[in-house]
């Protein structure tokens, strides 16, 4: 019988530390709901003491989820712990995650504390947290660069003070398989408690070993894995939870352990995070990449056609990838479109389907066939526009002279107010973005601009992601359209709209 491995998702906390990623309030809530649908055991919803926005997001998630534990991060500070309590007190299963650094380099250069000071702080703050929470998780930050005897003391101190979950973070992705497994084995054998203690692994991917080390931790006695969807996170990212889960599923013969994830929701969860983070999943990404179930070699194709298991160790359907796609066309009606939405796992009311069907017909008139990926793109684009405080209404371009272009942009807010401005630039994109900047009356820096095609072919829809720096804050925008310039403008407007929404601003004019 397989043992249960808990999944602790930190996409909304550690994942959001990815450069250029800044989820909006609505996006955080939608992500949390999808993570609950995916079946994660715990969601680290944020760091409530860090900002008002983080506090409100954690609070909303705690008040919304019904089955998943909601966790907030806290330093060894009573004010941090109080903030987590206030944010999560309405959760079905509130959890506080208390941490302090323990490695020599952190003690000397960051904390300016002795080992005795750290042990005293752990005892004081875990004890305090236990007065407010039934479940307290403790993490010795930079554990893998901490002397093992001192690490044992830190963990024993936390357990004695009431912690029942101990997380061992490989904060800078420094450890390797055998070493990390040994740390867990040592702790499980050395630390004593009358309570059941769950050991948790938290790995970063700086040396490309986050998933491998997470699996090694299970071999060493860990019963919880922490990570993010698609492996997003600061620097090289975190352990990709979908990879950990499928490794346990496929190699259950070795690990003898399983998660409780609804694996068929894996691809949908990955796509949602990719879209909101503005980070495209690499085509060759394990489990959820576009090429994960593709076979180019003739020998491989022949083998798969004869028997799929010759070159596939798991089925696409297992993770929610459809392989029985029946494209729609310009003659497809509302019923066929509605049935396609159901087949793709969408539960959309009839009123919303009317607008989506109009968008579908517009694309169908321009393409020979409309694929499932096109349908996903239509819905994704519609969701973004529906959530946005402002959206693109019209865009007009005109050639001026000497290589200059003129752009007239019209934006509409949720109340129906119209904002219009124009500008010129050395090319269409520059002209468009100058005009949008004028509408929102903000000076911006374009950090990143990426175009991807939703499908193959010259008639494919364009998917544009932008990252902007506005008043020292990074925001991302996303736009989909059959026209690249329209998609580019939508993405830029969305980035501005996100900034305005987070800062409760109204545009000028």
From Swiss-Prot:
GO terms for biological process: L-leucine biosynthetic process. GO terms for molecular function: 2-isopropylmalate synthase activity; acetyl-CoA C-acetyltransferase activity; manganese ion binding. Residues 5-267 form the Pyruvate carboxyltransferase domain. It is found in: Cytoplasm. The keyword Cell wall biogenesis/degradation does not apply. Residues 391-509 are annotated as: Regulatory domain. Keywords: Amino-acid biosynthesis, Branched-chain amino acid biosynthesis, Cytoplasm, Leucine biosynthesis, Manganese, Metal-binding, Transferase. Signal peptide: none annotated. InterPro entries: 2-IPM_HCS-like, 2-isopropylmalate_synth_dimer, Aldolase_TIM, LeuA/HCS_post-cat, LeuA_allosteric_dom_sf, LeuA_bact_synth, PYR_CT. Mn(2+) binds at residues 14, 202, 204, 238. Its EC number is 2.3.3.13. It catalyses: 3-methyl-2-oxobutanoate + acetyl-CoA + H2O = (2S)-2-isopropylmalate + CoA + H(+). Its cofactor is Mn(2+). GO terms for cellular component: cytoplasm. Pfam families: HCS_D2, HMGL-like, LeuA_dimer. SMART domains: LeuA_dimer. It comes from the Bacteria. HAMAP family: LeuA_type1 (MF_01025). Catalyzes the condensation of the acetyl group of acetyl-CoA with 3-methyl-2-oxobutanoate (2-ketoisovalerate) to form 3-carboxy-3-hydroxy-4-methylpentanoate (2-isopropylmalate). Belongs to the alpha-IPM synthase/homocitrate synthase family. LeuA type 1 subfamily. This is 2-isopropylmalate synthase. It comes from Staphylococcus aureus (strain JH9). The gene is leuA.
């Amino acid at each position: 019988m397989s043992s249960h491995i808990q999944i602790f998702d930190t996409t909304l906390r550690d994942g959001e530390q990815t450069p250029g990623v800044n989820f909006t309030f609505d996006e955080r809530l939608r992500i949390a709901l999808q993570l609950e649908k995916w079946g994660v055991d715990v969601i680290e919803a944020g760091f409530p003491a860090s900002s008002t926005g983080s506090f409100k997001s954690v609070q909303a998630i705690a008040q919304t989820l019904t089955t998943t534990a909601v966790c907030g991060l806290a330093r060894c500070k009573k004010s941090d712990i109080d903030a987590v309590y206030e944010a999560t007190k309405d959760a079905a299963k509130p959890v506080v995650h208390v941490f302090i650094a323990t490695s020599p380099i952190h003690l000397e250069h960051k904390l300016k504390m002795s080992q005795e000071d750290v042990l005293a702080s752990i005892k004081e703050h875990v004890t305090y947290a236990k007065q407010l929470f039934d479940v307290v998780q403790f993490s010795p930050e930079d554990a893998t660069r901490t002397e093992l005897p001192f690490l044992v003391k830190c963990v024993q101190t936390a357990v004695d003070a009431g912690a029942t979950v101990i997380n061992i973070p490989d904060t800078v992705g420094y450890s390797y398989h055998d070493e990390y497994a040994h740390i867990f084995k040592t702790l499980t054998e050395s630390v004593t408690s009358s309570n059941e203690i769950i050991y948790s692994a938290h790995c970063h991917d700086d040396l490309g070993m986050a998933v491998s080390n997470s699996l090694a931790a299970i071999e060493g006695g860990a019963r919880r894995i922490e990570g993010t969807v698609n492996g997003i996170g600061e620097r090289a990212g975190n352990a990709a939870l979908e990879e950990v889960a499928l490794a346990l599923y496929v190699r259950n013969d070795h690990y003898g352990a399983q998660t409780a994830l609804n694996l068929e929701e894996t691809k949908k969860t990955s796509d949602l995070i990719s879209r909101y983070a503005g980070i495209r999943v690499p085509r060759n990404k394990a489990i959820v990449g576009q090429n994960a179930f593709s076979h180019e070699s003739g020998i491989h194709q022949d083998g798969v056609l004869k028997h799929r298991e010759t070159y596939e160790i798991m089925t696409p359907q297992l993770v929610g990838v459809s392989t029985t796609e029946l494209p729609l066309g310009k003659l497809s009606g509302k019923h066929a479109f509605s049935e396609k939405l159901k087949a793709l796992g969408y539960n959309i009311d009839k009123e919303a389907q009317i607008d989506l069907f109009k968008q579908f017909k517009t694309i169908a008139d321009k393409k020979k066939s409309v694929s499932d990926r096109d349908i996903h793109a239509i819905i994704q684009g519609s969701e973004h526009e529906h959530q946005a405080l402002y959206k693109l209404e019209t865009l007009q371009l005109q050639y001026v002279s000497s290589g200059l272009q003129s752009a007239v942009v019209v934006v509409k807010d949720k109340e129906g107010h119209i904002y219009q401005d124009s500008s010129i630039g050395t090319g269409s994109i520059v002209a468009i973005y100058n005009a949008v900047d004028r509408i929102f009356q903000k000076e911006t820096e374009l950090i990143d601009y990426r175009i991807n095609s939703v499908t193959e072919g010259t008639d494919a829809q364009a998917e544009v992601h932008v990252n902007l720096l506005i008043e020292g804050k990074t925001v991302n925008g996303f736009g989909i359209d059959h026209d690249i310039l329209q998609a580019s403008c939508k993405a830029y407007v969305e980035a501005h709209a996100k900034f305005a929404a987070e800062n409760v601003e109204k545009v000028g004019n």
